[in-house]
């Protein structure tokens, strides 16, 4: 028996030794040839493959023989090398990959939660590079988003392809993310743009169309994802400071104050790799008096002092301080593991003005009760851990604590705490023998606690809770090295206080590469948006106009379908992409902020019960075409970059005559207003011609061109918006029927401004040397007086002097 065991062990060891002797190992590190930064590239040979870890290290074991090794990474030139391996050999091969400097490539992550060439994604996307933000001296990201094709910012609320209108800050159909984590407030679903770290943006990715499968409820019309930059071995230091002045109103009668309003600020960034530790530190300081006049007291008095960056005295003024930190550790003990924490702290004071005083002498002042002063404190902490396995697996755990405190001066404050957690498992099956196949699965848990004087419609003490649970799965497969297929499903469940609702949503898409740089795509995606705490329970007032709660409001659903083509081109030294898409988005239970007689006990004290409320208004549809063009041209020491787009939409109500709400007033009540007894799309619109939805801009033109000639740089931007045909008819009705209570001149303004808006910006800069640059940046150089949303004036001409210092690889 002992002899048999001995012989068996000897045979096993012999076989194992023989097997080991027949194989060989190739190992090494993959880096960027220019920056020496580690790259998570894929190495393939024969039917085997291996992915590098976060430090760029890889290892692949092969039988003896001669193989062609291929190394690929998006944005870098593919490397091929023939290697002959001998049995038992261990070969070191360090790989330095060259960036594709001779090709125009755009790499995105948002479309499928993994890196893809922008031409191969199945949805419509726009990408904005940070250079545009820096050159235009954009201090808050919403200013830069206005330059993106197909995107409009209406009073700080994002619209993508007319998928949303204006909700007075309650609810959003566009999900806003930073590094895939949502940043919309937990109570109102509203973005705080000044919180986002402008100083460390690597690029902005905009998905157009329903994206609820990957990004949840608020992605009904699209996603805006801000991606931050990782540090390199060489430190990066950036400093940008500016001082500017607004032009006075063109109409002297509207100017009731003396000196010009001013704006100043500073951004700073430091980032570096320290061994296995990545560190990013950023800060931003800004003081902006805005373009409106000084705040008046009850007697009409206002501040006449000099500019004080610590004090907010204008109706559009803001001061803000922000610090941010990104810390990532690449584990030395566990290969492939990295973990860390990101954090942002922001505090600022601002005035928000909803309605101007009147359309002549009061354009730059506020209607009584419509200006709110807010001291906002916003904090986020984002612990995370990511593990890259040997067989193409990626496990990621991302969490966030977000605390938002809006301390308002009119007893309308609110506070919310959000806890967010997402576990995601992603598998690249190439190392397991299935080429070009990636699966992504995840679980999401969100809990929100909110309290505030604004949200007493649910509980008298203003305390409300909300929760969200979701699971999702996405499959991405490439066939024949030309056809990309993507499909996904998500089940999402929401609860607010005691109400719970869940629903599955689906998406599918295909992208076919016809030629070297021609890509056809088709996609279908469903959306599901549960109302926010604000939409259900807000109780407040806008001067004399009340806002009412609607605890019975239902979730809205949608689908988005589109066909598109992206064409890459190279004409001499000019390279870029042209993209055209036709699309349709259909909504059910469409939520709109609607004016009506909502108080069951109307009196003169509550303005006959008139006010606004979020209600389900039936069906809606948006059809349109979207064209965009982006690219660059380079020769010698000169270059030109361009981004342009045109979007046409036809946003309509599909149920214009449906009575979607009735006034809760007894029919015998003498104060029942018959015009508001039954609410329909047509009856609540200022101009229901062709059933065009409210607060939509049907034509958008966006152009930005920047050129560099040696040390000099110039640039110009154009934004053109068509006339906003339809708004809430109540504004005009109130002005007609109750001029002593509400008379801002909206009827006259809209009659005189029917041609849309055309705004031009310009910039001119000089590089003193490789580190120092000075520039003059001007926005609205024609000093046009215009309002995208009626009753809210847009910025006057602003001229800034900018200084930039940059030290980076």
Regions inferred by a protein language model and the residue ranges of each:
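N-terminal periplasmic accessory domains that precede
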Residues: 92-95, 141-144, 159-161, 174-177, ...
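Short, acidic, small-residue-rich periplasmic hinge/interaction motif at the N-terminus
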Residues: 29-36, 41-44, 72-76, 86, ...
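Extracytoplasmic beta-strand/coil segments of soluble accessory domains associated
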Residues: 142-181, 185
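Short acidic/polar hinge/loop motifs at secondary-structure boundaries
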Residues: 59-61, 181-208
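Flexible loop and strand-edge segments within Gram-negative outer membrane beta-barrel domains
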Residues: 288-386, 402-420
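Membrane-embedded beta-barrel scaffold of Gram-negative outer-membrane proteins
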Residues: 396-406, 513, 521, 554-611, ...
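Structural signature of Gram-negative outer-membrane beta-barrels, strongest in the C-terminal barrel
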Residues: 5, 385, 434-440, 453-585, ...
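Gram-negative outer-membrane beta-barrel transporters
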Residues: 240, 584-586, 608-730
């Amino acid at each position: 028996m002992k002899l048999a065991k001995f012989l068996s062990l000897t045979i096993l060891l012999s076989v194992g030794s023989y097997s080991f002797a027949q194989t060989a190992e190739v190992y090494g590190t993959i880096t960027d040839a220019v920056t020496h930064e580690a790259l998570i590239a894929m190495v393939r040979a024969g039917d085997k493959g291996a992915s590098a870890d976060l430090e760029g290290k890889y290892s692949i074991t092969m039988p003896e023989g001669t193989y062609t090794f291929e190394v690929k990474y998006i944005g870098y030139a593919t490397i091929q090398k023939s290697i002959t391996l001998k049995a038992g050999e261990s070969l070191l091969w360090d790989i330095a990959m060259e960036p594709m400097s001779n090709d125009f490539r755009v790499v995105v992550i948002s479309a499928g939660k993994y890196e893809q060439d922008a031409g191969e994604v199945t949805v419509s996307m726009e990408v904005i590079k940070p250079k545009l933000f820096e050159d235009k001296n954009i201090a808050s990201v919403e200013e830069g988003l206005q330059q993106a094709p197909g995107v409009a910012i209406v009073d700080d609320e994002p619209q993508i392809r007319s998928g949303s209108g204006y909700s007075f800050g309650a609810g959003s159909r566009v999900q806003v993310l930073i590094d895939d984590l949502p940043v919309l407030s937990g109570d109102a679903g509203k973005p705080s743009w000044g919180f986002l770290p402008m100083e460390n943006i690597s690029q902005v990715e905009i998905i157009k169309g329903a994206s609820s499968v990957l990004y949840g409820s608020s992605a009904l019309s699209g996603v805006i994802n801000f991606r931050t930059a990782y540090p390199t071995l060489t430190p990066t230091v950036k400093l940008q400071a500016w001082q500017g002045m607004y032009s006075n109103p063109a109409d002297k009668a509207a100017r009731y104050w003396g000196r010009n309003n001013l704006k100043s600020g500073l951004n700073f960034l430091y980032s570096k790799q320290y061994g296995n530790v990545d560190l990013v530190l950023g800060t931003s300081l800004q003081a902006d008096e805005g373009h409106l006049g000084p705040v008046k007291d009850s007697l009409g008095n206002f501040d006449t002092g000099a500019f004080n960056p610590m004090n907010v005295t204008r109706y559009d003024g803001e001061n803000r301080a922000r610090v941010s930190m990104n810390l990532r550790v690449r584990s030395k003990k566990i290969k492939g593991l990295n973990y860390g924490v990101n954090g942002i702290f922001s505090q600022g004071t601002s005035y928000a003005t909803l309605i101007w005083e009147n359309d002549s002498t009061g354009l730059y002042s506020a209607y009584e009760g419509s200006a709110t002063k807010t001291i906002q404190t916003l904090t986020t902490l984002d612990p995370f851990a990511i593990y890259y396995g040997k067989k193409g697996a990626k496990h990621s755990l991302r969490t966030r604590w977000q605390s938002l405190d809006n301390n308002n001066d009119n007893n309308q404050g609110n506070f919310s705490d959000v806890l967010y957690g997402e576990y995601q498992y992603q598998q690249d099956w190439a190392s397991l023998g299935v080429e070009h196949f990636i699966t992504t699965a995840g679980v999401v848990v969100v809990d929100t606690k909110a309290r505030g004087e604004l949200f007493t419609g649910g509980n008298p003490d203003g305390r409300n809770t909300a929760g969200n649970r979701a699971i999702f799965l996405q499959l991405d497969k490439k066939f024949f090295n030309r056809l990309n297929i993507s499909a996904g499903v998500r089940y999402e469940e929401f609860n607010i206080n005691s109400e719970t609702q869940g629903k599955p949503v689906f998406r599918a898409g295909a992208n076919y590469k016809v030629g070297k740089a021609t890509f056809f795509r088709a996609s279908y995606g469903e959306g599901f948006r549960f109302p926010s705490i604000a939409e259900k329970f807000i109780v407040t007032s806008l001067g004399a106009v009340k806002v009412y709660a609607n605890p019975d409001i239902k979730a809205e659903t949608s689908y988005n379908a589109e066909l598109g083509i992206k064409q890459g081109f190279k004409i001499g030294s000019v390279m870029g992409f042209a993209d055209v898409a036709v699309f349709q988005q259909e909504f059910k239970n469409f939520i709109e902020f609607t004016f009506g007689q909502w108080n069951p006990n109307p009196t003169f004290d509550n303005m006959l019960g008139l006010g606004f409320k979020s209600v389900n208004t039936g069906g809606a549809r948006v059809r349109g075409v979207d064209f965009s063009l982006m690219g660059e041209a380079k020769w010698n020491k000169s270059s030109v970059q361009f981004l342009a787009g045109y979007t046409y939409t036809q946003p309509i109500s599909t149920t214009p005559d449906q009575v979607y709400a009735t006034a809760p007033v007894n029919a015998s009540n003498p104060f029942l207003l018959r015009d508001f007894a039954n609410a329909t799309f047509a009856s609540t619109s200022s101009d229901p011609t062709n059933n065009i939805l409210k607060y939509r801009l049907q034509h958008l033109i966006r152009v930005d061109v920047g050129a560099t000639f040696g040390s000099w740089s110039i640039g110009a931007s154009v934004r053109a918006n068509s006339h906003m045909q339809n708004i809430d008819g109540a504004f005009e009705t109130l002005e007609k029927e109750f001029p002593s209570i509400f008379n801002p001149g909206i009827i006259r303004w809209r009659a005189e401004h029917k041609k849309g808006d055309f705004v031009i910006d310009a910039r001119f800069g000089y590089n003193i040397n490789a580190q120092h640059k000075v520039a003059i940046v001007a926005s609205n150089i024609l000093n046009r007086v215009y309002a995208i949303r009626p009753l809210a004036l847009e910025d006057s001409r602003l001229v800034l002097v900018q200084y930039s210092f940059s030290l980076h690889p």
